[in-house]
């Protein structure tokens, strides 16, 4: 049997880039909660003892940016300089301006356009992907790497592993076979975890706890064997982490946010962007389309691309490829997608309820992936019934 290896990585919520994603989306939540018509393009950067938010926001909401920054950092676990950042005493810098009136008139006519007329906030192309290799219809490498990161945070916060600190990275290599275009996982080849830790814990304790409390609960036993390789804190020391260890910036973990290197990516990041930004809303609708194709049994694997021009409501193109796993021709699947999904940005926002913020709705997406999540707020994960014409 001919097989191949494929690898996906993830980072958990204490990674400095992910901290920035969460701050940007927490600000988006606050704006949309008070004013669903908010236009938000919020970036965040961080380094030792400093977090800065900057960008363009037009909103009627009254937003305390500094409080949101501190609350978000504190919620992650950055409560002292020792762990990488002190949420209550770090410098918070804010440089927020209003959206360019040139963009505003072209996209939403200064709020005079009907939802179906609202143009894309920028040009670009977005991809959605789905595969039948997991119940989530997501790549196994990505699912496992992401879940390992989430479990690291869980056992840190519930004190199962009190030596853990917020920053951490995971990576999983899976051996696959190609079944006529579909991906079939055979086994987990390698597991890599690098996690920030307290000064006093030994490397032996770290390895033991990671295997028992993180790896075993996450990776199904059927994928592990005596040949599986484990690299657990292979650098030997990871005490300095978070923004103290590395600078962070919104939008630098776009592959982790999506499909772990599978499918394709149109390069636009998600966090800190309201639904008129098709980098986000376009990627959400094509994920729903691709997932619906696979869930309907029309293909075992599917990628969908959509593209836009700034200020234009209708997409420029829609493309589908089922990697030769389709039960009907790709052109017929494309016709079904076009019949069942409205790719106009204003209608995506309505149909996926994307104008609703607050209650951590968008902040939740900013760590542990935007796709494959079984939560009501992830409306784009809801499958549409697709039936080919007789």
From Swiss-Prot:
GO molecular function: ATP binding; metal ion binding; methionine adenosyltransferase activity
Principal location: cytoplasm
Chain residues that bind L-methionine: 56, 99, 246, 277
Cofactor note: Binds 2 divalent ions per subunit. The metal ions interact primarily with the substrate. Can utilize magnesium, manganese or cobalt (in vitro).
Annotated binding of ATP, by residue: 15, 167-169, 235-238, 246, 252-253, 269, 273, 277
Gene3D superfamilies, per database record: 3.30.300.10
Catalytic activity: L-methionine + ATP + H2O = S-adenosyl-L-methionine + phosphate + diphosphate
Binding sites annotated in the UniProt record for K(+): 43
Subcellular location: Cytoplasm
Name of this protein: S-adenosylmethionine synthase 2
């Amino acid at each position: 049997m001919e097989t191949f290896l494929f690898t996906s990585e993830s980072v958990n919520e204490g990674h400095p880039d992910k901290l920035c994603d969460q701050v940007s989306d927490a600000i988006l939540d606050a704006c949309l909660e008070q004013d669903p018509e908010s236009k938000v393009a919020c970036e965040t950067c961080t380094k030792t003892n400093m977090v800065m938010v900057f960008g363009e926001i037009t909103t009627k909401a009254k937003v305390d940016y500094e409080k949101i920054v501190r609350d978000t950092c504190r919620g992650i676990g950055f409560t002292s300089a020792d762990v990488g950042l002190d949420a209550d005493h770090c410098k918070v810098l804010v440089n927020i301006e209003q959206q360019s009136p040139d963009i505003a008139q072209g996209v939403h006519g200064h709020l005079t356009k009907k939802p179906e007329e609202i143009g894309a906030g920028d040009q670009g192309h977005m991809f959605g992907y789905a595969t039948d290799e997991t119940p989530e219809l997501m790549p196994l490498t990505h699912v496992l790497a992401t879940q390992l990161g989430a479990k690291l945070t869980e056992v840190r916060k519930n004190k199962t592993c009190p030596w853990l600190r917020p920053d951490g990275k995971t990576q999983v290599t899976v051996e696959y076979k190609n079944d006529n275009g579909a991906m079939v996982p055979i086994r987990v080849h390698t597991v890599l975890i690098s996690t920030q830790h307290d000064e006093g814990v030994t490397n032996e304790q770290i390895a033991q706890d990671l295997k028992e409390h993180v790896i075993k609960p996450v990776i199904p036993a059927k994928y592990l064997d005596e040949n599986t390789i484990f690299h657990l804190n292979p650098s030997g020391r990871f005490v300095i982490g978070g923004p103290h260890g590395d600078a962070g910036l919104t939008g630098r973990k776009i592959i982790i946010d999506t499909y772990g290197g599978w499918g394709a990516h149109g390069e636009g990041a998600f966090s800190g962007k309201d639904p008129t930004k098709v980098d986000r809303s376009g990627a959400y609708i094509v994920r729903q389309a691709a997932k619906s194709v696979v869930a309907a049994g029309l293909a075992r694997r599917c990628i969908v691309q959509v593209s836009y021009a700034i200020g234009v409501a209708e997409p420029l193109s829609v493309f589908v490829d089922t990697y030769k796993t389709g039960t009907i021709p790709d052109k017929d699947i494309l016709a079904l997608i076009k019949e069942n999904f409205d790719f106009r940005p204003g209608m995506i926002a309505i149909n996926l309820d994307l104008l609703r913020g607050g209650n951590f709705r968008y902040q939740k997406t900013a760590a542990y992936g935007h796709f494959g999540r079984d939560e009501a707020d992830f409306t784009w994960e809801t499958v549409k019934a697709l039936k080919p014409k007789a």
